C-alpha cells in the first residue's frame, strides 16, 4: 500500500479524451443580493483532473459547494447548470439529489476535525456512509468494506482502528479517512476543497499522491480547490483561475504555470515563494554579534507522570538582535511548545532561557518576547474593539495612562499600515491580512525585543503573505527586532531567514545558514522535508511581466 501511495503523480500525461462526465455551464451563485460566482464554465471527463485556484473571496470554494448543492445558509444557484452524466443537479428535487450526493459525486472537506463526528468511531461513520446508499447488506460485509476503504487510503492497521474516534488519528490520517468516506460508493467525481491546507509537507505529499492515484487508477474525475499553485501543479492536469467570482483563465496546468496570459495569473505566480530562491534576510538586516536570547537544554513533556510524552528534548538555540531564525518541522515536532515556553506560557521541565545574559522569568518574558499567532481570526477577541485588543499588553504591564495608551495604539496601527481610525472598529470588519497586521501591532505594543511568529502567514493567500512578510522585514529593520519565524513552508522560511533550525521529534537535528540548509542539507530528515515541497515549473522568460 505504501509503495502505491508514494508513487509520484503523473499529471504531465493527461488522460486520453473521454466523454464529458461533469459539465458546468454558466454557473451563477448569489448570497442575498451579492453575486459570489458569475458564469463559471468547465467540463471534466472520467479520469481527468482539474484544479481551481484563487485567493479568498474568489468564489472557488463556493463553486465547489455548488457542484453538490451544499451551499451555506443564504446561498443559492441563480443561473446555469451542473450536469452529471447529462443530469442537471442544479434542477433536481432535494430527494433525488440525496441519492446522487455521496454516491456519484462526493466531497472531501478542508478541515477533517470539523467534518468528522467526534462522538462516533471511524468504523461507525464509515458504516453509516455505506448504509446510506448500499442497501441492506450484512453488518460483517460492511465492516469488511470499511477496512478495505481504510487500507485503500493508507491508514495503518485498518482493522484494529475501526473502533477509534477521530481525535486518536493524526491530521493526515483524518484526511485519509475523509477520502475513504468519499470513496464509499465509488463516486464518479471527487471534489477536494483545500484538502492539504493544514498539513505539513511530507503528509501533504502523501495526500496529493493518494488523490492522484485514485484519479489515475480508479478513473475518478478529480476537482481540487486550492490557493496553493504548487498543490495544483502536483495533482491536476488542467487549471482554472478564479477572481471575484469569475474565471479569468483556464487551460493545461503546465502552460498556465509557465506562460500565463492573464495579469492576475501572472501576479499570483509572481507572489509564490520559491524554494530555489536565495534568502533575502541578509539584505534586510545585519544580526548583532552577541546573542540576545539563549536557550540551553530546554525540555518539556506532557501527560501523566508514568507515561509522559516528550515534546522537547535538550533544545539549544541562539537568537541575535536583528536576526530572523527560521524554525521548521512537522506537526508534533515541538515547534509550538518551544514558542509557548519562550513567551512564558508553558514553563519548561528542564533547561534555561536567558535574555541579554539574565534569566528570562515569566513576567519579563511576557514583555520582552511577544507572540504573533497563526490564526488571525481566532486570535482576536471579536467582542473587543481593535484599539482595546492592541492595548491589552499595555494594560497588562501597566504601561502609560489612558491617553498615552490611545496614542500608542494609533502609532502602532500606522506602523503596521492601517489607519488610526481602525481602533474604534471590530475585528470582524477586517480581512485576514488586515487582522494579522492587528495581531502584529498588539505584539509590538509593549516594545519587545523578540517576536515569536508561529505560522504567521500559513492562513493567508500568497499575495497577502508577501505583504505581511514585507511588513515583518520592515519592522525588523526599523526596530532591530530578533525574530523566531516558525513555519512548515520551507520556501517562505528560506526567503525570510538568516539561519534555519530543523526540529524533529523534539530535538534540533540541524541548523545553519538558510541557503546552506536548503541547498546542502546534512540530516536525512531535512532532506525529506525539502523533497516533499511542491514545486512549480519555471516560467518562460518574460511571462510574468
Task: Please annotate each region the language model reported.
Residues 184-188, 445-449:
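A short, proline-enriched helix->beta-strand linker immediately N-terminal to the Walker B motif
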Residues 164-169, 173, 426-430, 434:
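Conserved ABC ATPase signature
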Residues 247-251, 259, 508-512:
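ABC ATPase "signature
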Residues 76-88, 351-361, 365, 510:
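Conserved ABC transporter NBD signature motif
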Residues 68, 72, 343:
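Helix-to-loop junction immediately C-terminal to a conserved catalytic motif
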Residues 88, 141-160, 404-421, 531:
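Conserved ABC ATPase "signature" region
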Residues 177, 182-183, 438, 444:
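ABC ATPase C-loop
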Residues 89-106, 124, 132, 254-260, ...:
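ABC ATPase NBD coupling module
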Amino acid at each position: 500500500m505504501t509503495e502505491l501511495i508514494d508513487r509520484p503523480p503523473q499529471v504531465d500525461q493527461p488522460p486520453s479524451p473521454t466523454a464529458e462526465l461533469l459539465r458546468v455551464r454558466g454557473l451563477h451563485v448569489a448570497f442575498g443580493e451579492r453575486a459570489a460566482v458569475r458564469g463559471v464554465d468547465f467540463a471534466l471527463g472520467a479520469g481527468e483532473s482539474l484544479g481551481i485556484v484563487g485567493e479568498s473571496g474568489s468564489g472557488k470554494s463556493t463553486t465547489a459547494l455548488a457542484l453538490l448543492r451544499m451551499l451555506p445558509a443564504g446561498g443559492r444557484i441563480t443561473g446555469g447548470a451542473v450536469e452529471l452524466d447529462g443530469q442537471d443537479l442544479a434542477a433536481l428535487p432535494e430527494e433525488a439529489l440525496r441519492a446522487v450526493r455521496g454516491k456519484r459525486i462526493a466531497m472531501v472537506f478542508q478541515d477533517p476535525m470539523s467534518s468528522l463526528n467526534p462522538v462516533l468511531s471511524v468504523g461507525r461513520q464509515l458504516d453509516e456512509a455505506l448504509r446510506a446508499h448500499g442497501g441492506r447488506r450484512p453488518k460483517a460485509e460492511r465492516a469488511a468494506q470499511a477496512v478495505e476503504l481504510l487500507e485503500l487510503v493508507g491508514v495503518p492497521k485498518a482493522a484494529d482502528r475501526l473502533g477509534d474516534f477521530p481525535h486518536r488519528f493524526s491530521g493526515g490520517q483524518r484526511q485519509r479517512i475523509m477520502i475513504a468516506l468519499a470513496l464509499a460508493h465509488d463516486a464518479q467525481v471527487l471534489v477536494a476543497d483545500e484538502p492539504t491546507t493544514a498539513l505539513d509537507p511530507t503528509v501533504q505529499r502523501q495526500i496529493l499522491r493518494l488523490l492522484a492515484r485514485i484519479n489515475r487508477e480508479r478513473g475518478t474525475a478529480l476537482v481540487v480547490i486550492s490557493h496553493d499553485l504548487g498543490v495544483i501543479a502536483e495533482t491536476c492536469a488542467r487549471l482554472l483561475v478564479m477572481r471575484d467570482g469569475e474565471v479569468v483563465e483556464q487551460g493545461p496546468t503546465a502552460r498556465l504555470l509557465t506562460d500565463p496570459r492573464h495579469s492576475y495569473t501572472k501576479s499570483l505566480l509572481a507572489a509564490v515563494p520559491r524554494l530555489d530562491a536565495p534568502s533575502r534576510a541578509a539584505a534586510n538586516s545585519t544580526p548583532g554579534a552577541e546573542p540576545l536570547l539563549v536557550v540551553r537544554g530546554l525540555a518539556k513533556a506532557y501527560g501523566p507522570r508514568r507515561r509522559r510524552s516528550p515534546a522537547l528534548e535538550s533544545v539549544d538555540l541562539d537568537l541575535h538582535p536583528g536576526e530572523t531564525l527560521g524554525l521548521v518541522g512537522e506537526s508534533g515536532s515541538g515547534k509550538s511548545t518551544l514558542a509557548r515556553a519562550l513567551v512564558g506560557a508553558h514553563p519548561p521541565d528542564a533547561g534555561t532561557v536567558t535574555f541579554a545574559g539574565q534569566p528570562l522569568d515569566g513576567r519579563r518574558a511576557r514583555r520582552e518576547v511577544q507572540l504573533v499567532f497563526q490564526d488571525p481570526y481566532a486570535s482576536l477577541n471579536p467582542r473587543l474593539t481593535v484599539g482595546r485588543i492592541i492595548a491589552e499588553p499595555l494594560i497588562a504591564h501597566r504601561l502609560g495612562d489612558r491617553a498615552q495608551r490611545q496614542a500608542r495604539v494609533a502609532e502602532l496601527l500606522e506602523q503596521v499600515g492601517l489607519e488610526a481610525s481602525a481602533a474604534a472598529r471590530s475585528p470582524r470588519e477586517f480581512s485576514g491580512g488586515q487582522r494579522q497586521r492587528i495581531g502584529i501591532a498588539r505584539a509590538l505594543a509593549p516594545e519587545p525585543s523578540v517576536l515569536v511568529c508561529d505560522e504567521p502567514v500559513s492562513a493567508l493567500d500568497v499575495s497577502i503573505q508577501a505583504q505581511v512578510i514585507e511588513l515583518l522585514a520592515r519592522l525588523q529593520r526599523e526596530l532591530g527586532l530578533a525574530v523566531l519565524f516558525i513555519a512548515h513552508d520551507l520556501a517562505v522560511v528560506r526567503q525570510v531567514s538568516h539561519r534555519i533550525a530543523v526540529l524533529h521529534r523534539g530535538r534540533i537535528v540541524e541548523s545553519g545558514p538558510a541557503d546552506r540548509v536548503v541547498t546542502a542539507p546534512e540530516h536525512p530528515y531535512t532532506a525529506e522535508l525539502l523533497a516533499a515541497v511542491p514545486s512549480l515549473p519555471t516560467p518562460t522568460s518574460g511571462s510574468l511581466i
